[in-house]
Each structure stands twice: as structure tokens, then as C-alpha cells.
């Protein structure tokens, strides 16, 4: 019943994108194209002022795009030099436009508003990028790390260039998908931001590490291990991201009819309802595939370039917070990533908590707040 409406919307979105490509290509990245009010669901309680900006950025295959972000200002008069900026890289909400953080707000409302409200109360302005294709024309290349880094850096560049009350000094903070985005941002912030910005460091909680290793066995004979429905949703989002970034792979040809149907459903369903639907239908990951993904030539190399976290090249301090009861990411892999960074002489510190994936976010604040304060000191 919704297919004709969706098809029409996609057609209009594509036409809109094509009509605007010359403008996007001519606009320097990190430029505000428009600014307006945020929906109530996306407005952080306690913010003295909030806005939604559209800005120029980069998406898959270095194509120019328009992305969106929410900007939150703390109460009171800004200090000399402007409010220091926290770039908030949010966790997975879905890949459809209706799921965008600056449109629908967070999926974990109480958790995220408590977390961001704490940063706001410390005198930081917050710039929350949606990532390319979320809430704006085009597809969202889910977990494409370099694209996420571009989007986060360009959002900060756009906001600080547009609002004179914001400082050029900034740090990035992220959770889950956003922690991966924060780590990629940490690797490329100085390069992508250039002399216009003063990048100071990064915080990541629940960081998904070495996903490229975890995805290698996916295929029709994956054992029916009991997984969270949200984990199956993540797989579908990753497959959609690969389809967007590497159309030549013909990802659909590796899927069963049911797999292709779920891939299509995941394109528009946000995380929580998609997880509920997958759980209600008792979907098993192996049932999605008609042949192993490992048949893709150089699959591990391709995945590493797409979503593998960089193991060196960081020029500012990194804070990794990990819950020891976290089952949304593979905790031993995150701990291994921290150990690899330390062995490689990277400026990282690891903090662990007796919490799950979600609980670690606010539990980390007693450690991450002073860490970030020192970055701006």
C-alpha cells in the first residue's frame, strides 16, 4: 500500500538531488545552506537556543551532498572566544530520513538527554550531525567511517562559521555507531578541519571494533545463535550501507527473497521498530543469505577500508569507555582495539564499567568530563 508513495518520494528525492548537484559541487564543504527551528522531539531540554542546519559535506565515493545537524546552545552569555563545542556523534537510529536525530530526536530519549544535558550544563555548545543521507536527499552509507568523519567535521565547521557565539575549539563525543564515527573523526579531524578549526580530542563509549572480522562468516550456513533482534537490524543496515557505497557488488544477489525483502524494509524502518519486527518474525541471520558474503573478492580488505577503525595516525587524546556487560558490540574486540592503539603508541586511555551498552554512556561521565575539561584547559 505504501510502495507507490515511497516510489514517488524516492523519484522526487532523486530529481531534487540531480537538480542541486552543480550547487553542491560549487559550495565549499562546511558551509551552512539554511538554518531553522528543530522539531520538539529533537530539542534538547535546557538548551537556551536550538536550531537545525543544513550544510555542505561529502558522502560515499567523495560525492558532494547536503547533510543536517542539530545545534544546541547553553544558557547564559558565551565566554570570551565563544562557547567550546562538543560534536555529538549519535548511535544507530536507523537509515531512513524519518529516523534522523535532528528530525525525530534520540531513540534512547532519557539516556541521551541526560548525557547531552550534562555537557550543556558544563558550558559546552553541542553540534549533533545526522550523517549523510539521514534527513536529507540520498542514501545513508551506514558505518562508512570516512564519510562520518567528513560529516562530523563539516557540521562543526558549518556551525562555528555561522554562529559567532561558538568557539573554534572542539572535541568529538560519540556512542555506539557514533563512537566509531568519533574514532574516525579523531583520525581525520585535523586534516579535514584545516586551520579553520581547533580540534582537541575524542570520547567514545561502546565502540564497535573489528566488525570487518565479525562479518566475514555471514552466509546461509551461519549457526542459528540467539542474537538480539537489534543485532540483526545492524546487519541489515550494514548491507544497505555496502549497497550504497559499492553498488558494483550487487549485494542483493547474495540474499534470499526474504533477505531482499528485509533489506528493503530496513531502508525505511528505524532501529527500535525494525528490531521489534525482526524479533516478532523470529528472523535468523543465516536465513537472509543465499550464498556466503566471503565470495566477494577481497571482502576483508573492502570491509576494513569501509568500516575498519584506524589503528594509528591519531594526533590528539582519545578516551574509550567500555561496559563489561555490553553485548551490542563485541566487548573483547573493543578491548583488543584499545590494546592495539596503546601498543602502537597512540594517545588513548581506556576506562571500563560494570554496565551494558547503554548504561556505559552516563556511567562514563565522572571520567570523561574531567578528561574533556583538560583538553580545553
Region roles according to the model:
Residues 185, 316-318, 330-340:
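Short alpha-helix in the alpha/beta-hydrolase fold that links the catalytic acid
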Residues 314, 319-326:
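Short beta-strand/loop motif that positions the catalytic acidic residue
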Residues 3-7, 22-78, 342:
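Catalytic-loop region of hydrolases
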Residues 206-309:
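Accessory cap/linker subdomain of secreted extracellular hydrolases
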Residues 292-303, 328, 335-377:
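C-terminal catalytic histidine-bearing segment of alpha/beta-hydrolase fold enzymes
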Residues 157-229:
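Primarily recognizes the serine-hydrolase "nucleophile elbow" in alpha/beta-hydrolase
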Residues 68-71, 81-94, 98, 103:
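Short beta-strand element of the alpha/beta-hydrolase
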Residues 115, 142-163:
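Alpha/beta-hydrolase active-site loop
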Amino acid at each position: 500500500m505504501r510502495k507507490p508513495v515511497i516510489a514517488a518520494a524516492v523519484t522526487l528525492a532523486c530529481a531534487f538531488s540531480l537538480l542541486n548537484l552543480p550547487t553542491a559541487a560549487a559550495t565549499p564543504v562546511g558551509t551552512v545552506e539554511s538554518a531553522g527551528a528543530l522539531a520538539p522531539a529533537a530539542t534538547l531540554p535546557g538548551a537556551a537556543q536550538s536550531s537545525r542546519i543544513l550544510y555542505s559535506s561529502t558522502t560515499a565515493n567523495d560525492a558532494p551532498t547536503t547533510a543536517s545537524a542539530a545545534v544546541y546552545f547553553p544558557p547564559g552569555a558565551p565566554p570570551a572566544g565563544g562557547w567550546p563545542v562538543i560534536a555529538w556523534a549519535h548511535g544507530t537510529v536507523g537509515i531512513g530520513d524519518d529516523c534522523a536525530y535532528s528530525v525525530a530526536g534520540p531513540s534512547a530519549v532519557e539516556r541521551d538527554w541526560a548525557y547531552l544535558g550534562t555537557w550543556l550544563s558544563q558550558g559546552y555548545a553541542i553540534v549533533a550531525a545526522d550523517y549523510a543521507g539521514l534527513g536529507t536527499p540520498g542514501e545513508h552509507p551506514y558505518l562508512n567511517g570516512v564519510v562520518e568523519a567528513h560529516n562530523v567535521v563539516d557540521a562543526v565547521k558549518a556551525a562555528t562559521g555561522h554562529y559567532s557565539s561558538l568557539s573554534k575549539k572542539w572535541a568529538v563525543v560519540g556512542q555506539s555507531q557514533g563512537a566509531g564515527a568519533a574514532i574516525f573523526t579523531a583520525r581525520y579531524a585535523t586534516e579535514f578541519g584545516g586551520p579553520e578549526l581547533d580540534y582537541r580530542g575524542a570520547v567514545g563509549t561502546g565502540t564497535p571494533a573489528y566488525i570487518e572480522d565479525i562479518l566475514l562468516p555471514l552466509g546461509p550456513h551461519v549457526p542459528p545463535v540467539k542474537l538480539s533482534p537489534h543485532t540483526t537490524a545492524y546487519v541489515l543496515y550494514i548491507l544497505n550501507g555496502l549497497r550504497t557505497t559499492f553498488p558494483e557488488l550487487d549485494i542483493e544477489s547474495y540474499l534470499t527473497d526474504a533477505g531482499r525483502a528485509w533489506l528493503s524494509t530496513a531502508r525505511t524502518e528505524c532501529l527500535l521498530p525494525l528490531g521489534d519486527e525482526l524479533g516478532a518474525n523470529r528472523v535468523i541471520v543465516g536465513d537472509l543469505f543465499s550464498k556466503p558474503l566471503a565470495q566477494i573478492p577481497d571482502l576483508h580488505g573492502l570491509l576494513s577500508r569501509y568500516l575498519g577503525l584506524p589503528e594509528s595516525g591519531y594526533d590528539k587524546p582519545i578516551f574509550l569507555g567500555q561496559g563489561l556487560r555490553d553485548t551490542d558490540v563485541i566487548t573483547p574486540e573493543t578491548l583488543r582495539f584499545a590494546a592495539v592503539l596503546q601498543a602502537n603508541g597512540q594517545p588513548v586511555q581506556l576506562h571500563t564499567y560494570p554496565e551494558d551498552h547503554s548504561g556505559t554512556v552516563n556511567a562514563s561521565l565522572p571520567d570523561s568530563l574531567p578528561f574533556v575539561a583538560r583538553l580545553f584547559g
